[in-house]
Curated annotation (Swiss-Prot):
This is Adenosine 5'-phosphosulfate reductase. Belongs to the PAPS reductase family. CysH subfamily. It comes from the Bacteria. Binds 1 [4Fe-4S] cluster per subunit. HAMAP family: CysH (MF_00063). Keywords: Cytoplasm, Iron, Iron-sulfur, Metal-binding, Oxidoreductase. Catalyzes the formation of sulfite from adenosine 5'-phosphosulfate (APS) using thioredoxin as an electron donor. PANTHER family: 5'-ADENYLYLSULFATE REDUCTASE 1, CHLOROPLASTIC, 5'-ADENYLYLSULFATE REDUCTASE 3, CHLOROPLASTIC. GO terms for cellular component: cytoplasm. Its EC number is 1.8.4.10. The active site is at residue 240. It comes from Neisseria meningitidis serogroup A / serotype 4A (strain DSM 15465 / Z2491).
Amino acid sequence: MKIFKPALWKIPPIENGSETALAEKTETLKQRLHRIAGSHRDARFASSLAAEDMVITDLIAGENLNIGIFTLDTGLLHAETLNLLDRIERVYPHMQIKRFQPIREDALHYVESKGRFAFYDSVEARRECCRIRKTEPLDRAIAGADAWLTGQRREQSATRTELPFAEYDAGRGIDKYNPIFDWSEHDVWAYILANNVPYNDLYRQGFPSIGCDPCTRPVKAGEDIRAGRWWWEDKNSKECGLHK
């Protein structure tokens, strides 16, 4: 008997005639990054290693901007994500990406008191896991900085449709920027494919949005690009708490 396999999301191809529009968007993004670097003594980019984050990373490296880059190694990342980190270090040897990990005792206590996969039990349990593995390490990563950057885009989810370029992170008392906020998925991939920017191998396996291994799965063609993130929850709760 033939087993039916649903068609999965695929990396969008470069659209014909998009070169001029992409060049304009790229120039605007460069200007935004230069503005951020020039107006802050210590700006730091929180890279999730997603495709849009790799666009920003490539421009920071290419423009030699004074913007530090870090990523959150949650302890639950896919092997493909860790492999990407190694590739980034080879492609951009002059650039250091700092890794911030959860406090080991807190992560162990969560597992021992609640269970290894307790994040499937409730939104509260999942958010507590995200707090330990993402939010607390992020707070350490931007401590002392006067601005931080994200790779968030308006198109990504229902909770990001009004995302601005610049905002104030009142909870942390720091300026926050979303420099690629107005790029589309096609813009992101057109840049990556045209400039041979390294990206996570999971994208070729139907993952348009990538988080921790237990909380991410492939997405079917036509589904929301974040449908594979915390798929057991309501779409309006699908945030990890980093962007309060």
